[in-house]
A protein has these predicted regions:
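A short, polar/charged loop/turn motif at coil->beta-strand junctions and beta-hairpin connectors
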Residues: 41-43, 257
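Terminal alpha-helical segments
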Residues: 7, 84-91, 105-107, 111-117, ...
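Flexible, active-site-proximal loop/turn residues at the rims of small-molecule/cofactor binding pockets
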Residues: 53, 81, 269
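Generic secondary-structure microfeatures
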Residues: 51-53, 78, 201, 206
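Metal-dependent nucleotidyltransferase catalytic core
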Residues: 2-35, 41, 60-125
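Short gly/ser-rich loop at a beta-strand->alpha-helix junction or flexible surface loop bordering the NTP-binding
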Residues: 44-58
Length: 314
């Protein structure tokens, strides 16, 4: 695996070194009180930079009208499946990375990370999942415990890839549309908390749709901000769905992000009908972008497989 970061500016290289230091500090703290044998033996086997900062083409324009900048995308590989638990081992790292970016200003680039075992990554490669194949092809190792390589990818045949993409599209998009209908009904009934939850679920499923169709992988999370970051790496049309230049726009998205838990369980959660309608328009725009991107991807796979039946209208 590549280890060279010479294509990055010196300040980005220094920043990645700082991020790596933070990862190890927080991971060691998370293991410090462990008494079980497996926890004492816990370690990080690899930290891999992937995405735009690995392959080139990153965007760093936080002060423009779009207000978009690429994240450092990191795959952290650990030696035990139990160490992938977000709440137990990685929540404090997430909080610290956000704090050092937004408050302490010791970081200037957002950091986005996922955690898997080597077996999970190699299984993804063995099943021809594009996400893991791209990581193996373009990724840059920032840390390796040993020189144990990732397995050689086994790409799916064109027919297999097409069948899987269609299956994901036909399963996940209707689910997103169903929750969007539920959101509209709930707004009409004046049940704004249910409307917020249903709209969150619609957006979440749209992101799962585009990630699964295009990469055959999606993180098993409900964090809308995290999913948005993952998906927006695929196509800039997904960025356009969410205005984010005004603080008010960003605050509305945060309310939607919180709705997965708070709209169901917190008596203090508040959202207005105007906010919901604005967010609903954004999710509709997101849905149009997802449908277009997935349709194009499936058409591309059909061409490779020598097939060309049209997608059913949605």
């Amino acid at each position: 695996m590549k280890t060279d970061l010479d294509h990055l500016p010196a300040n980005k290289q220094r920043e990645l070194e700082r991020v790596k230091q933070i990862i190890f500090e927080e991971f060691e703290d998370a293991l410090a009180l462990g008494t079980m044998s497996w926890k004492k033996k816990g370690r990080i086997d690899k930290i891999i930079l992937y995405g735009s900062y690995a392959r080139g083409g990153w965007v760093d324009e936080p002060h423009t009208a779009k207000g978009y900048r690429s994240d450092f995308d990191l795959l952290i590989i650990v030696n035990d499946k139990r160490l992938t638990e977000k709440v137990d081992f990685w929540l404090k790292l997430d909080d610290r990375l956000i704090r050092e970016l937004a408050i302490d200003k010791t970081l200037h680039t957002p950091v986005n990370f996922i955690v898997h075992t080597l077996q999970e990554v190699n299984d993804g490669l063995a099943h021809g999942r594009y996400f893991f194949m791209d990581v193996a092809k373009d990724g840059i190792a920032l840390h390796e415990f040993d020189d144990k390589p990732l397995h050689t990818p086994k790409p799916k045949t064109p027919e297999q890839a097409l069948a899987m993409a269609r299956e994901y599209f036909e399963e996940w998009l209707p689910s997103a549309q169903s929750f969007h209908r539920g959101y509209k009904h709930a707004v009409g009934d004046g049940d704004l908390k249910k409307a917020a939850f249903d709209l969150h679920q619609s957006a979440e499923r749209l992101y799962h749709t585009v990630l699964l169709v295009c990469t055959f992988y999606t993180p098993h999370v409900h964090n809308l901000g995290f999913l948005r970051i993952q998906a927006e790496r695929l196509d800039m049309r997904l960025v356009d769905a969410w205005p984010r230049e005004r603080r008010e726009d960003r605050a509305r998205f945060e309310k939607l992000k919180e709705a997965y838990v708070k709209a169901r369980y917190s008596k203090h959660y508040r959202i207005t009908e105007d906010e919901l309608r604005w967010l609903g328009d954004c999710v509709e725009e997101l849905g149009r972008a997802v449908h277009a991107i997935c349709s194009e991807r499936i058409a591309e796979l059909e061409a490779r497989a020598g097939q060309n039946p049209p997608l059913a209208p949605v």
